[in-house]
Amino acid sequence: MSFTIAIIGRPNVGKSTLFNRLVGQKLALVDDKPGVTRDRREGQARLGDLDFTVIDTAGLDEGPRGSLTARMQEQTETAIAAADALMFVFDARAGLTPTDRSFADFARRANKPVVLVANKSEGRHGEAGALESYALGLGDPVGVSAEHGEGMSDLYDALRGVMPEPTEEAEEFDDDDIIESEDISQRPIRVAIVGRPNAGKSTLINYLLGEERLLTSPEAGTTRDSISVELNWQGRDFRIFDTAGLRRRSRIEEKLEKLSVADTLRAARFAEVVVLMMDAQNRFEEQDLRIADLIEREGRALVIAVNKWDLMGRQSSLIAALRTDADHLLPQVKGMPIVAVSGLMGEGVDRLMTAIQDAYAIWNRRVPTAALNRWFEQAVDANPPPAVSGRRLKLNYVTQAKARPPSFIVFCSRADAVPESYLRYLVNSLRGFFDLPGTPIRITLREKANPFAHKRKRKS
C-alpha cells in the first residue's frame, strides 16, 4: 500500500530542495525568492529501503480569500488531507518565526504523524536553531542540509518511526543511501584547502592531479576563485576546493579580493573536511588561528598540513612542537591531525590523504548509547558540577542529537547555571573517552521539565 508524506512549512525554508533530494530529480523549481512553488507537486521517493509518495507544497502563508496566496494555501491543505504523515520543515539558520509557530499548531491539528525537519542545520547557527525547535512540541528535530545531502540517515530513522515496516528486514543506512540522479554512494568527500596566500595550496592540488591544472606563482594571490576539481586517490573519490588565500579583512582593498575571501568562506562551509595549509617557515600566525576558528565554528573537520617541509630540513622535532602549540592555541579541536608535506616534491601526500579520510570518519561518528551513558556517569562522578549559590546542579542524562559534527544534548536541572569551564571539561572528557581528535564537538545543555512545578505553583 502506498504511503504519502506531505512536505509543509512557511515559504523559502527549503521544501522544494528536500523534495528534489528525495525524488532524485530536479522536478521542483528552487529559488531564494519566497513563493516559487505555487502548486502541489508529487513524486516517488526512495530513502534506503523506504518507498513512498512525497508531495511538495506551497509555503503555508496567510492571504485574502480568493487571492493567489489563499489558493496556494488551499492546495497545501488538500495535500495535508491526502497525506498519511507530514514533514514540517523550518529554516534552522533563521530560527523559529511566529509563522513557524503558527503553522506548527496547524500541523498538530491535522492529527497526523509529524516529522520535524530542521533544514540548513549545518554550522553553529543552524544547530542553535534546531535546538530551539524543541519548543514547538513536535518531538526531536531532524537536522539536515537538503542542499548538501547531510542528515539523510537521521531522516530515514525518523520516517521509519511513522511509516509501516518495510516488507524486508530493515538495514542500517548512511546519508549516501538516498537514491539520486547519480549513485550517491560514490559521492566524493568534499575537501576545502584553505590558508594564507602563497601557502602552496594550488601546488599541492597540481601534484595530486599529476598535472599543472591550477596556476602557481611565488606572488601571493595568484588564485582568485574557489576552484573545484575531482580526484580519485587510491580508489576513494574526493572533490577538492582550492581557494584564494584568506587575509585579514582590514587589509583587503581590492573589490576582487573581497569577493575571493567570500568565495573561500563559502567553500569552507560547503566542505566536510577542511585542510588548513601553513608554510613551515611561518606557522601559526594570527591569521592561521582565525581561519581555524572559522572552521571550528562552521562545524567542519580540520586537518593541518605544514607545507614546504623540505625547506626546513625535515626536522621531526618541529612536528612535535607544532602538536603542542596546536593543542594549546586551538583547544576546541584538540588532537587535530598535523601532517608535514611538500606539495612540490610530493612528500607526505599519502599521509595527508589518509588523515583526511580518518577525519571524515570521526566527523561522521555516532556513539553507541550504552557507551555514551557509561562515559557520562564516569565523567560526572569523577568531577561533579560545582554548586551555584549553595544549590547543587544535577545532570540527568545525555543523548547524541546528530553527527557531522558529533553533537550532544545534556539534560540537567539548571542549564543557565552550568559554568563554561564545566562544559569544556565534558567536551574534553568525551573527546578523550571516544577518541574524537580534530573534530568540533557540540554539547548543548537543556533543562529537564519538572513535573511537580505546576503543583507547587498551585499551592502558593
Curated annotation (Swiss-Prot):
Q: Does the keyword Membrane apply?
A: no
Per UniProt, subunit arrangement is: Associates with the 50S ribosomal subunit.
Keywords noted in UniProt: GTP-binding, Nucleotide-binding, Repeat, Ribosome biogenesis
Q: What family, per the record?
A: Belongs to the TRAFAC class TrmE-Era-EngA-EngB-Septin-like GTPase superfamily. EngA (Der) GTPase family.
Species whose genome carries this gene: Nitrobacter hamburgensis (strain DSM 10229 / NCIMB 13809 / X14)
Q: Which Pfam families match?
A: KH_dom-like, MMR_HSR1
NCBIfam families linked: GTPase_EngA, small_GTP
Keyword Cell cycle among record annotations: no
* Ranges of residues in domain EngA-type G: 3-167, 189-364
User: What the protein does?
Assistant: GTPase that plays an essential role in the late steps of ribosome biogenesis.
Query: What is the designated name of this protein?
Result: GTPase Der
Give GO MF terms, alphabetically: GTP binding
Q: Where is the KH-like domain?
A: 365-449
Q: Which residues bind GTP 2?
A: 195-202, 242-246, 307-310
Q: Give residues annotated as binding GTP 1.
A: 9-16, 56-60, 119-122
What GO biological process terms are annotated to this protein in UniProt?
A: ribosome biogenesis
